[in-house]
A protein has these predicted regions:
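Conserved RecA-like ASCE P-loop NTPase motor core of nucleic-acid helicases/translocases
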Residues: 17, 272-279, 432-438
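Conserved motor-coupling elements within RecA-like helicase/translocase cores
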Residues: 305-322, 329-336, 471-487
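ASCE P-loop NTPase motor cores of helicases and related translocases
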Residues: 177-329
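Helix-hairpin-helix
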Residues: 1-17
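Structural detector for short beta-strands of small beta-barrel domains
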Residues: 31-56, 94
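Post-DEXD/H (motif II) to motif III coupling segment of the RecA-like Helicase ATP-binding lobe
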Residues: 335-340, 346-426
């Protein structure tokens, strides 16, 4: 069968077909013992009819057991008596009922083929056609040629070519056993990883970059963590390659990714580097860090929406590193000398924005700049594994210093306790942030808005600052608060990247309305420099299991795993469905070991088989490289 014909059934590949398991089975095996619930076939002789109130009862005789049996039909059609003619001998298939020694079958079918287990598919196609399709294509040889291990292939074959023992176990468990479920999960994961790997396209690098970053690292007033050094080495290898780098660098809040960004600039030097950040506050903060730590010989420039600099002129001059916001996307830039393009907090940008940033530095279609994306929003290992098929992934899984943050769930009765804590922190010259869910009052919210709560805090504490995403002066407010403030009233705008070194406490109102990743980013604003930190979750639902799990874990990677359990994974292939399940059998939060095995198997493969043999996965049933 050709790939086109397979596509008529809605499948693009043999492995995809192999995960389309039957929803159930019917047995035409001859029943070998008469007991309640026995399913299968009996050879019977028709003796008489009895009809009443839209019910037809046919008295018959089970020949193999020499026992009477009643065949019952509700709302019988006229053809029933033709199928079960008096004195005829037929094979009937159904489920046996034993009512106190009186045997019966409800709505039995007449069959011509006996001693078979018939798969039943949920499909708009004819069941017979699906059986023909699966039984002709799904064989041990074909599945192993697709790369599946023999144990997985064997279990999958049994799904579509069931025997009596398989059917017995299926009926007893009312579903597939663990070995069969494992095979379905493995096949689905393997197929998905394979599809992702073919989505990746590599290009030649504009420049091979071999700048001496090690000397710069050794000159720093502190030592990079082992994780930072490992990731720097991975990036250095990328940038020295003839192939354009395409790498995502992930780490927890406070993992020190800024130093990895600056090290990457040193690797690219003397060629130029470009960095885009999601907000001007974060971009300016990165600019200040670059000025502080990079050699004074480097010319570093910050570009904001208000900047009047001529970028063409800048790049024609000796500028080495440009840092900016999305304003970079709307400026004329000569990208000839740009070797490295980076985006910080990459998830804050759309795919089109990141692509356009890359295009700024691309001179021709045959080569591309090195691309690095940075994120302080960890994702689970299984999702990182999926990402890694399209883009290289590095993980900074170590913090420069351990974070000491106590997370407490509170509700209204404990508000005085919270107030006392805030007073103590303010008196100790430490800062507090209070995060509101809304700026203005809303009838739909049971919580106070920022505007409603503002007067309460201003009458009790000095140096109270207030801002939100709607505030045009928010960046100025944040800067003033960082220098002089005691309490900051804000929305989630402080979620990403903002440095508030004196912030010891964050109070998040209505945390149940926020995603766990956002909660973790907000909590990560405190204890930035080893300061003892406190996070209070003020909620009307203190018994929330989701919030309790969040409060019990500090690691962003643990939080990502918990979030995955509640939210499920999005579709990495097409960028759709960032929430909601897309897997039929596998579970990203529970099947990590299966992901590891499938990924290792796929990584070990040097090539994908290609053949004109229709049994081959590279052949007519749908080549893997066609995904």
């Amino acid at each position: 069968m050709s790939a086109q014909e397979l596509g008529k059934f809605g499948f693009s590949h043999l492995l995809e077909l192999a995960t389309f398991a039957p929803s159930g089975y019917e047995s035409t095996m001859l029943i070998d013992s008469l007991h309640n619930g026995a399913q299968g076939a009996l050879e019977v002789q028709i003796l008489s009819y009895k009809g009443y109130a839209k019910v037809l009862q046919i008295s018959a005789y089970a020949l193999a057991f020499s026992q009477p049996i009643t065949l019952t039909f509700f709302h019988p059609k006229p053809y029933i008596k033709r199928l079960f003619a008096l004195d005829s001998v037929v094979f009937v298939q159904g489920v046996l009922r034993d009512d106190g020694g009186r045997l019966s079958m409800i709505q039995p079918k007449t069959i011509r083929e006996i001693n078979a287990i018939i798969p039943k598919f949920k499909t708009t196609h004819k069941n017979a056609d699906m059986i023909s399709l699966t039984q002709s294509l799904i064989t041990q040889e074909a599945l192993q040629e697709c790369g599946l291990p023999s144990d997985v292939a064997d279990s999958l074959v049994r799904i579509f070519h069931p025997d009596k023992e398989f059917f017995r176990i299926f009926c007893a468990r009312k579903g597939f056993d663990e070995k069969t479920l494992y095979a379905l999960k493995f096949c689905e994961i393997y197929c998905h990883l394979l599809r992702l790997s073919t989505k990746r396209t590599d290009y030649a690098a504009k420049y091979r970059c071999t700048g001496d970053y090690q000397s710069w690292v050794e000159s720093l007033p502190f030592t990079l963590t082992n994780a930072q050094q490992r990731v720097c080495a991975q990036i250095a290898s990328d940038l020295a390659s003839h192939k354009a780098a395409k790498r995502l660098v992930m780490g927890d809040v406070g993992c020190g990714k800024t130093m990895v960004i600056l090290a990457s600039v040193m690797m690219a030097y003397p060629k130029k580097s470009l960095l885009m950040a999601p907000t001007s506050v974060l971009a300016k903060q990165l600019y200040e860090q670059a000025l502080l730590y990079l050699p004074k010989s480097l010319n570093i420039t910050y570009i904001s929406a208000e900047s009047k600099q001529d970028l063409q002129g800048l790049f024609a001059s000796q500028v080495d590193f440009i840092i900016g916001t999305q304003a970079l996307l709307y400026r004329e830039i000569s990208g000839e000398e740009i070797a490295l393009v980076m985006s910080d907090e990459q998830h804050r940008f759309g795919v089109k924005q990141r692509h356009y940033l890359e295009k700024l530095a691309q001179v021709d279609s045959s080569s591309k700049p090195h691309i690095l994306q940075f994120s302080a929003t960890p994702i689970p290992r299984t999702m990182a594994m999926l990402e890694s098929k399209m883009i290289d992934v590095s993980i900074i899984d170590e913090l420069p210093y351990p974070k000491d943050i106590t997370t407490t769930i509170i509700s209204k009765p404990r508000f005085p306790e919270l107030l006392a804590h805030i007073s103590a922190e303010v008196q100790a010259a430490r800062q507090v942030a209070i995060i509101y869910p809304l700026v203005e009052e809303s009838q739909a919210s049971e919580y106070l808005s920022l505007k409603e709560g503002e007067s309460f805090w201003r009458t009790r504490f000095p140096q109270v600052y207030s801002t939100s995403g709607q505030d045009k002066e928010k960046e100025k407010v944040l800067e003033e608060f960082a220098q002089n403030g005691s309490i900051l009233l804000a929305t989630t705008l402080i979620e990403v990247g903002i440095s508030l070194p004196k912030l010891s406490t964050i109070v998040i109102i209505a945390p149940e309305k926020l995603g766990l990743a956002t909660l973790h980013q907000l909590r990560g604003r405190v204890s930035r420099n080893g300061l003892k930190g406190y996070c209070y979750l003020y909620t009307h639902t203190p018994d929330s299991a989701r919030l309790r799990e969040f409060a019990a874990h500090l690691s962003g990677f643990d939080i990502a795993q918990i979030d995955l359990k509640y939210r499920k994974g999005g579709d990495l292939l097409d960028g759709k469905r960032q929430s909601g399940a897309q897997w039929i059998w596998a579970d990203l939060s529970e099947d990590e070991a299966i992901f590891d095995r499938a990924n290792a198997l796929l990584t070990d493969k040097k090539s994908i088989p290609k053949s004109n043999d229709s049994r081959d996965c590279g052949g007519a049933v749908g080549a893997l490289h066609d995904f």
